[in-house]
UniProtKB/Swiss-Prot annotation:
Domain YcgL intervals: 1-83
Recorded coiled-coil stretches: none
Entry protein name: YcgL domain-containing protein xcc-b100_4189
Lineage: Bacteria, Pseudomonadati, Pseudomonadota, Gammaproteobacteria, Lysobacterales
Organism expressing this protein natively: Xanthomonas campestris pv. campestris (strain B100)
Pfam families: YcgL (PF05166)
Length: 86
């Protein structure tokens, strides 16, 4: 399976993987309103052996097959001072 990766130009470290190049119609309108415009980054073959930096390739493939897109949000970092240890 092939995926086409785009980065949001509004939200840093947010990426959209599409099953079909430039087919933004599969992304819900409310998501597009928050993240668009998108800039093309790369196309990638999502083979079972493929390792992605922040996403699980099996999860991405499943989302592409069922929804036509996968949304990769930035990782959240919890600082020690922000944790509730009680």
């Amino acid at each position: 399976m092939h995926a086409y990766v785009y980065k949001s130009q509004r939200k840093q470290d947010t990426f959209v993987y599409l099953a079909t190049r430039d087919d933004f119609s599969v992304i819900p309108a409310d998501v597009q309103a928050r993240l668009a415009p998108f800039a093309f980054v790369l196309d990638v073959a999502l083979t079972p052996e493929r390792r992605l930096a922040q996403a699980d390739a099996d999860t991405v493939r499943a989302a592409l097959a069922s929804h036509g897109f996968y949304l990769q949000l930035p990782k959240t970092v919890v600082l020690a001072g922000e944790c509730d240890y009680d």
